[in-house]
Amino acid sequence: MSSDSELAVFGEAAPFLRKSERERIEAQNRPFDAKTSVFVAEPKESFVKGTIQSREGGKVTVKTEGGATLTVKDDQVFPMNPPKYDKIEDMAMMTHLHEPAVLYNLKERYAAWMIYTYSGLFCVTVNPYKWLPVYKPEVVTAYRGKKRQEAPPHIFSISDNAYQFMLTDRENQSILITGESGAGKTVNTKRVIQYFATIAVTGEKKKEEITSGKIQGTLEDQIISANPLLEAFGNAKTVRNDNSSRFGKFIRIHFGTTGKLASADIETYLLEKSRVVFQLKAERSYHIFYQITSNKKPELIEMLLITTNPYDYPFVSQGEISVASIDDQEELMATDSAIDILGFTNEEKVSIYKLTGAVMHYGNLKFKQKQREEQAEPDGTEVADKAAYLQSLNSADLLKALCYPRVKVGNEYVTKGQTVEQVSNAVGALAKAVYEKMFLWMVARINQQLDTKQPRQYFIGVLDIAGFEIFDFNSLEQLCINFTNEKLQQFFNHHMFVLEQEEYKKEGIEWTFIDFGMDLAACIELIEKPMGIFSILEEECMFPKATDTSFKNKLYDQHLGKSANFQKPKVVKGKAEAHFALIHYAGVVDYNITGWLEKNKDPLNETVVGLYQKSAMKTLAQLFSGAQTAEGEGAGGGAKKGGKKKGSSFQTVSALFRENLNKLMTNLRSTHPHFVRCIIPNETKTPGAMEHELVLHQLRCNGVLEGIRICRKGFPSRILYADFKQRYKVLNASAIPEGQFIDSKKASEKLLASIDIDHTQYKFGHTKVFFKAGLLGLLEEMRDDKLAQLITRTQARCRGFLARVEYQRMVERREAIFCIQYNIRSFMNVKHWPWMKLFFKIKPLLKSAETEKEMATMKEEFQKIKDELAKSEAKRKELEEKMVTLLKEKNDLQLQVQAEAEGLADAEERCDQLIKTKIQLEAKIKEVTERAEDEEEINAELTAKKRKLEDECSELKKDIDDLELTLAKVEKEKHATENKVKNLTEEMAGLDETIAKLTKEKKALQEAHQQTLDDLQAEEDKVNTLTKAKIKLEQQVDDLEGSLEQEKKLRMDLERAKRKLEGDLKLAQESIMDIENEKQQLDEKLKKKEFEISNLQSKIEDEQALGIQLQKKIKELQARIEELEEEIEAERASRAKAEKQRSDLSRELEEISERLEEAGGATSAQIEMNKKREAEFQKMRRDLEEATLQHEATAATLRKKHADSVAELGEQIDNLQRVKQKLEKEKSEMKMEIDDLASNVETVSKAKGNLEKMCRTLEDQLSELKSKEEEQQRLINDLTAQRGRLQTESGEFSRQLDEKEALVSQLSRGKQAFTQQIEELKRQLEEEIKAKNALAHALQSSRHDCDLLREQYEEEQESKAELQRALSKANTEVAQWRTKYETDAIQRTEELEEAKKKLAQRLQAAEEHVEAVNAKCASLEKTKQRLQNEVEDLMLDVERTNAACAALDKKQRNFDKILAEWKQKCEETHAELEASQKEARSLGTELFKIKNAYEESLDQLETLKRENKNLQQEISDLTEQIAEGGKRIHELEKIKKQVEQEKCELQAALEEAEASLEHEEGKILRIQLELNQVKSEVDRKIAEKDEEIDQLKRNHIRIVESMQSTLDAEIRSRNDAIRLKKKMEGDLNEMEIQLNHANRMAAEALRNYRNTQGILKDTQIHLDDALRSQEDLKEQLAMVERRANLLQAEIEELRATLEQTERSRKIAEQELLDASERVQLLHTQNTSLINTKKKLETDISQMQGEMEDILQEARNAEEKAKKAITDAAMMAEELKKEQDTSAHLERMKKNMEQTVKDLQLRLDEAEQLALKGGKKQIQKLEARVRELEGEVESEQKRNAEAVKGLRKHERRVKELTYQTEEDRKNILRLQDLVDKLQAKVKSYKRQAEEAEEQSNTNLAKFRKLQHELEEAEERADIAESQVNKLRVKSREVHTKVISEE
């Protein structure tokens, strides 16, 4: 299992391919009881999960997950797998293998959208019925080069394995994609082709276009484009699949020697051509017909002379004409583009379209029977002209060839008459033949285009053939398809189960071979063997008088009761008739044999074929150029030789099918197959749903459960010996001895023998141990128990060890403390002794003597080192000389090795050539054998035909004899008649005498004749009146058809407009969502990229630092000269070895080349020699590495002594290193030629070095990052603390934000309500459209009835004409008899009298006949009158229907208008909401800003209050004697209370004002400007107050001093105070008047600003009570500060406003300075304060007035909004009522439709009864029609009322939509912004995709290198152990050398 990081390469497809690491861990840790968790059989769901409750006497009680309790037998309970097997990727690995385990594993994976699962060697895929992101380019890249076990299950994995097998095994591959119809075979085929087209060109340049200009795309584009073209002409909708392939195809993709695409070809099988002329009710014909009529390319409609309505063409409209999941317009463009890409010429392209159109016109050809003959004649030539024009034929010739074909009889051509039925059958056969031959020609043309003539070596074939089909009506096509699937299933069984059992034999396991593949042999033999179904069918086709009944009887005689697979079908009521049933592997299929003989013979009109051959259209002439041999051609482009081989003019469809099937099976047997089994999860095409019975049936049919069967009999679980030993060694470690080598197989045998398990449940193979199902799970449980015990013991021992260690430390610490205490006590006792003091003085003097001794020894050592240095210098010079010679020898050795490598390459090339010639010879042998088989078949057929011709010749001889006899008889009769003529002439002469007697009789006859002529004239008058009525009816029908056509066009236009609007709306919504998602993703990716860039920059800096370090290391590496000196000696020794080995290798190479030439391609000796050479090279390399390591160890000691003298040899060391690296590289290249792995090892070693460097740099970075991290951590701590403070302060603002969001949610709910109403209106519109369609169908049916009546009338006219002809014939006979009697009267009077009597009788009979005809004409006249009345009634119904349709159209247009207006309103409301939110936020920020400024002013006023309080105290001391002072204080207190009350009211009103602010839209900007002005004014005035307070303080001090010094100043100040008091009282009165006026104006204004006014009044008038208000304001200040922290971002937007405020503040400061000079006395100060107060009050009163206006407007807006909401609610209710009414009307319409259908049936019956004289039924039907007309009129009245109500609603909706105009403008601005963002997002997305692609490729390279690195590390470990041994030896040798010296 891969980790989450490895799954990241799959991108967003990862969760759809494999469980995440967290899910896997959770599954393993989930509680599970293996003894009680089971699957139990259950009748409804087949199997359910449950837990065992009890077991009693073979019965088991189980409680299911649903809570039900079941009691079943033991064999109906199946154990459940442990949780770690949940959603397992390979079901063959499960512990318990049975049906429910497989079913639930597929179900759980399907529920998680993991649709691919392995089951042993093949892959199971379940159709998801939805798009999944598992086929994207990054997924293709992720699967490339991956082994099957390395990646999740996928069709790409199967494809890549086939590709890799082809490259490595040099064998052709095939991928068989099978399953039932609708299981997803075609989609998986397309994915396989997509994968090969992607990976086989990666890294290659696009192929250049051929100079001829035919190819419009690259080869991979053409391979992919072939699929849409084939799907358009070969796929159709069936009952089970909307895009079912109605032909089989085997696509071969050829690859060159390098694995790149070379070419491709396609073989097709069994195109279902009957679908061209016939479809079932729920199906439709091939897609191309509906693509053309989709009107996506109007020029096609004009060119093909067709309409856009498929119902105009019977061949393509017998079933459905549209498919919900297919867009025919888009598919037409894809088909057209594919034709261009595939290189079809423009002429060929036009021919394809024209032939397709001609097939459609063929269905409209009509023929009628000639009068008094069985000969057919054309019924109109318009359609024939169109068809002939499209095929470049003569219309008259075409019709003549169809009605009068020429047939060769003997040596002459005879014109043959055809009946209407025969001509219709011939037209259908021609249409099928043209379509089939065109399809096969297109396939051949595609193969011609895909054949690039490039060298190709192997191919991969992809088989996509129609799945098993069981329909209600199954014909010959279904038998062929099901037989093909039967053969493929047999091939699958043989391949899968034989391989499984061959592996047992290969591993040496005793096994009895079981032939599972023979299970299907009985059914296959029944169909294809001699005297089988196909054989009997072909035999019947040989006999001219054979019929379907004779064929059926032969089948019954031959097989019924004799073959178990052949049965008589059961008769089921309501189901199509069936003649026999076959038991296939997928179920029992009932077949109907009607028309099989004709289908099998497939005859064509040879005269028309001759016209085709002479056609001016080259393509058509080419299709039928080999008409006699065309029937023998193969069904695919690859089977071109089939027709030429057969060469006969008569080959049946079944024989051709069997021939192609045998070729397919031969192809498959010559390849290595890969199987993909597709599963249908449910019949309803519901994503995510799985029907248990259906899936189990398919699993049984597909062989999945058959594979489980062999797994249960065999050994499904298998593990390599080494893996088993490693994993399960813990079960009994003593069984495998430690410290000695033991083979993994023997270790596994010992281990299993020592475990208490059933030893018959496993077998030992050569490389693996095989287990029965379930045993591996038991071993897992035992291992878990053992691990639990071991871990418990380990924990106990660890804890004991730690406790003992801690105890030992405590003991050691205790002893050390005792020791230290003892020594200190002893020292304290002796430190005052005199001797001890002497010792302390002498001790330091002893060190100088020791240092002198050490200096002497160091000098001696220095001398020795100097001598050794001189010796080493001499040695170094010698080694340098040796190194030069060694370098020359190395170069020579290198040249020799290179020569050997060239010889080896030549040998390998010769070997490859021999292998190629062998393959070519084998291919030629296969071709020769195939030709021989074909020739044998041809001979057999020729002999059979010879016998048949001999029989025919004998029959012809008999016919000739009979004709000769009849000729003789005819001659005798001729002579007799001549004699009679002579006698008659003699009698004529005698008859002349009797003329006179007959004159009287002649007159009587003339009178009778005149009477008949009069009667005939009356009949002709009646006929004329009938023809006039007929013409009138035809005109009415034409008018109705024209009106119906207009209605259809209108309806189609409306539907297109509606679909376009809905599509645009959905696209807009989806695009917005996609843009938002992509924006978030891109933001995240940008952050990641920025982080990566910063990391890369830091890495670059580290690399620079590393470069400096490497320069230092270069100097250190110079010390390795001594190592290289030792290596020189080793190189000499290795050179001798290499020389010897080289000679041996060259000799062996010559022997190998001779053997190869003698053996003609035998490569086994070459492989063995390669292995030997590889081993010898490995030995050489190990010897060289050992010598190198040995010398490194020896040089380590010398490096310490000669470190100073090595600097000069640095350059030489570098040269030696380069030489060494070059030699190693050359060795690795030689090894790479022998074995490809050597190059990987070299790259891995380099990567390892780079990684080590990167590791060192990363360590340095890590240390730096740690320091940075600590600093960042400190900053983070500071920031977190600050954030905590900010969060506490932001609580209040978040609460207000929640309130605003609640309001937004309320508005969004309103928006959703509107959208729901819009959806409801859409639904009603769709229902109205459906009703309109139903009425259109009714009109069409009534037209059909009119046609039937017209045909009956024509038949009556024809019968009347026949009677007239009979009458005229009788008159002529009378005249003849009269003349005869006149001539013979004299001689034969008596005979004439008798003739006269006879003539009179005949005349009487004729008259009676005329009377009967007249009666019949009268009855027909009455019938015609009645039918005419009915037609007029129907016309009235049609007119009413048209009126209803017009009303519905009008209603639909009104609904469209309402829909558009509501859309516009919703968009404008949304924009209005966003604007109001934005403006509310800005207003809130401005409000909080003003509050902030105001609270700052309050802080400044605090000092003012304190100073004013002191001043008031002084003034109160001075004014104690004034009686008026108390009165004033009392009044001020009243005012204070009143102001406080107003304050409370203002606070309550503030909340209401904040709520109402949300509804203000247009006035907010003006308020903001005014608020800015107020703020600047307040700031200015606050600054003035600050300065005034300071000045007041100074003035008050001076005044107090002056008042104390002089009484005059006191009196003056007292008078001033009295004057001030009076003035303030007057000012106070004025202020009260202004205040009352302001209160009246601001009654409905913003209470927030009134609160501010109250606070200002309270501060200025009652300074002594300001402390309490100050505390309240402090609380408010705290709240505002918390809000301000949240709104800091918005404050930045208002900086411009703040700058303006700063400028006004500076002006105010200047004014404050001027005022401070004027304010010197208390009187002037108080006066200025009062003036300021007045100004503020006037400003505030103005603001309040304006706010009152704003609030009034807000209330008006609210009332309008409420009124609009109530209106919308009323409209919603009325719309709901209208919807109910529409639903009722819809139901009535459906009833009417059903009634109309019943009436049509009854009308047909009534017409038949009318012809027979059934007048009672006609009267009943007429009464019923009148009742229905009354009901239709009542329904029309209701519809009119509904339309009136809708018009009222439309007016209301228009009134509401006017309010959404501004929102629409905002949405346009937003749309522009979205477009810009979309452009940016696309650019970001493109960059991100490029980056992801690059990262994926790098990641793949990294994984590959990592894998190679692991292998190199293993080899390095082995080499390291050997190096250590050599180092030990080298140290010993070095010590010996030193000791000897």
Swiss-Prot record:
Q: Which residues carry this modification: N6,N6,N6-trimethyllysine?
A: K130
- SMART domains, alphabetically? IQ (SM00015), MYSc (SM00242)
Q: Where is this region: Disordered?
A: 1128-1149, 1155-1174
Q: Which sequence positions carry the modification called Pros-methylhistidine?
A: H759
Q: Which CDD domains match?
A: MYSc_Myh2_mammals (cd14912)
- Specify the Myosin N-terminal SH3-like domain's residue ranges: 33-82
Q: Please name the Gene3D superfamilies in this protein's record.
A: 1.10.10.820, 1.20.5.340, 1.20.5.370, 1.20.5.4820, 1.20.58.530, 6.10.250.2420, Kinesin motor domain (3.40.850.10), Myosin S1 fragment, N-terminal (2.30.30.360)
Residue positions where Phosphothreonine is found in the record: T64, T69, T419, T1243, T1257, T1288, T1469, T1503, T1519, T1732, T1738
Q: Which residues form a coiled coil?
A: 845-1941
Name a Pfam family for this protein. Myosin_head
Bias regions of kind Basic and acidic residues — which residues?
1130-1149
Where Phosphoserine occurs, the residues are 392, 625, 1094, 1098, 1164, 1239, 1245, 1263, 1290, 1294, 1305, 1308, 1476, 1497, 1516, 1556, 1576, 1602, 1605, 1716, 1728, 1741
**Which residues are annotated with the PTM Phosphotyrosine?**
Y389, Y1494
The yes or no answer to whether the keyword Lipoprotein is present is: no
Which disease appears in this protein's record?
Congenital myopathy 6 with ophthalmoplegia: A muscular disorder characterized by mild-to-moderate muscle weakness, ophthalmoplegia, and contractures at birth in some patients. Muscle biopsies from patients show predominance of type 1 fibers and small or absent type 2A fibers. The disease is non-progressive or it progresses very slowly. Inheritance is autosomal dominant or recessive.
Q: What is known of its domains?
A: The rodlike tail sequence is highly repetitive, showing cycles of a 28-residue repeat pattern composed of 4 heptapeptides, characteristic for alpha-helical coiled coils. Limited proteolysis of myosin heavy chain produces 1 light meromyosin (LMM) and 1 heavy meromyosin (HMM). HMM can be further cleaved into 2 globular subfragments (S1) and 1 rod-shaped subfragment (S2).
Similarity field: Belongs to the TRAFAC class myosin-kinesin ATPase superfamily. Myosin family.
Subunit architecture: Muscle myosin is a hexameric protein that consists of 2 heavy chain subunits (MHC), 2 alkali light chain subunits (MLC) and 2 regulatory light chain subunits (MLC-2). Interacts with GCSAM.
Function text: Myosins are actin-based motor molecules with ATPase activity essential for muscle contraction.
Entry protein name: Myosin-2
Q: Which organism is this protein's natural source? A: Homo sapiens
Q: What is the lineage of its organism?
A: Eukaryota, Metazoa, Chordata, Craniata, Vertebrata
